[in-house]
Amino acid sequence: MLLAEIISVGTELLLGEIVDSNAAFLARELAARGITLHRKVVLGDNLKRLAEGLRTALARADLVIVGGGLGPTDDDLTREAIAEVLEETPTEDPALLAWLEGLYAARGRPMPQVNRKQAWLIPSAQALPNPVGTAPGWFVRTGGKIIVALPGPPRELQRMWREQVLPRLPLPDHALFAVTLHTQGIGESNIAELLGDLTKAANPSVATYARQTGVDVRVAASAPTAEEARALAAPVLDTVRHILARWIWGEDGDTLAGAVTQTLGGRTLGVIEAGSGGALCLLLADQPGFLDAAVTVDHARLITLGLTPVTLGSVGVVSEAAARELAAGAREHLGAEVGLAVVTATAGEQAGQAFVALSAENAENVAHVNWPGDPAQIRERAAVAALALAYRTLRLPQPSGKAGHA
């Protein structure tokens, strides 16, 4: 079994100024290939601590992936740390230096002298070309172990991982098969209760993860071959699908917006948002069938979109009645076959309150959610609640009634 560790380098990561999306990407990539990730570490731009971290990782892992610290400045120290740990001296590689100078020449600029360190190599390192940046990576074999050093910008790291690193990695001795089921409308603890002892098994394993769009359930199995891993996971996967059938909206790379589009069955969708700042439109932007939208908190504009003055005066915008009227208004005033509305408040006494409603020819529904949080969280949760309501209603049409809970 190939064991891996990830070291993310950068004081800005350590201080929380930048989110470490690289480690999340690499973790998913390793899992998909049956490589076991044991640890993820964040280290600042300090040569001593980087060297110590590398020594520790090499003592317990077969593959160490270092992200960041390959820039041209004095605080980019990944190359120096690897060289120190392996007791090798970096030297300028003529081919890398010529490549770097060519990049700057193509831009009509001379190469700054500080960039020369990006042409360094040690004897045990192979340079990894960077097609979208100036920092080559390193692929190092030492004592039966592998060190991979990649630049920090995600666009560079991800492309180099796929094009340069994966072809060089040894194949794992076991194959992994995994499927992630996406659910909505049920909490993580409720899922755990329903699944019972299934979550205690090691192979196949069943794990739950809370996400913005609901709760994910991952079923994974490992075996000597891909076919054996799939066969091992199949009965457990079927059981989980059966238990959670009423809440599952998709699998693996599916999106909730995409699932809603499927339930539309070719019908057009119109959206009215009041208070959510276009969060719902952002989720739907690339979906076919998304016809039109109105995003506003202006009362006069909302009245032209279907909100009645009576409702505005009696219960206000953030109300079940307003959501229902605006969902119907999305059909009437935006010309859509299905109308979806979200009304929410991100501040004041009603902060965190949201009503979402759907109106279609043969289906209407409304739901109420109350999730306190910062304004961005409130907007995102309201938008997801609207999509969840649309999916449930359009998949299994139900009579309209009082507001439920999304």
UniProtKB/Swiss-Prot annotation:
Pfam short name (any one): CinA
InterPro entries (alphabetical): CinA (IPR050101), CinA-like_C (IPR036653), CinA_C (IPR008136), CinA_KH (IPR041424), Competence-induced_CinA (IPR008135), MoaB/Mog-like_dom_sf (IPR036425), MoaB/Mog_dom (IPR001453)
Domain of life (superkingdom): Bacteria
Family: Belongs to the CinA family.
Annotated NCBIfam families: cinA_nterm (TIGR00200), molyb_syn (TIGR00177)
Name by which UniProt lists this protein: CinA-like protein
